[in-house]
Amino acid sequence: MQEYIKNEVETLRLRAGATQEDLALRVNVSRQTIIALEKGRYTPSVLLAIKIAGFFKMPVEKVFKIHHGK
């Protein structure tokens, strides 16, 4: 069974009324990185995950979750 990280970044960002650019600027990455992250094509570093969770004022484990797939 393969493990992978799922995230709630897009859902939380939309709920917060923030654009991809807003989030990217706040966590010091490109908008393209946020796009890739939201589409599940990019797994963030621990530092970036902490910054993103901080942006939403949530624990990292509420934003990023380990899933088990086939």
What are these language model-derived features?
Residues L14, L25, G54:
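Alpha-helical residues within the helix-turn-helix
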Residues G17-A36:
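Short alpha-helical DNA-recognition segment
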Residues Q32, Y42, E61:
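Key DNA-contact positions within bacterial/archaeal DNA-binding proteins
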Residues R41-K51:
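Short, basic-rich loop-to-helix N-cap that marks the start of a DNA-contacting helix
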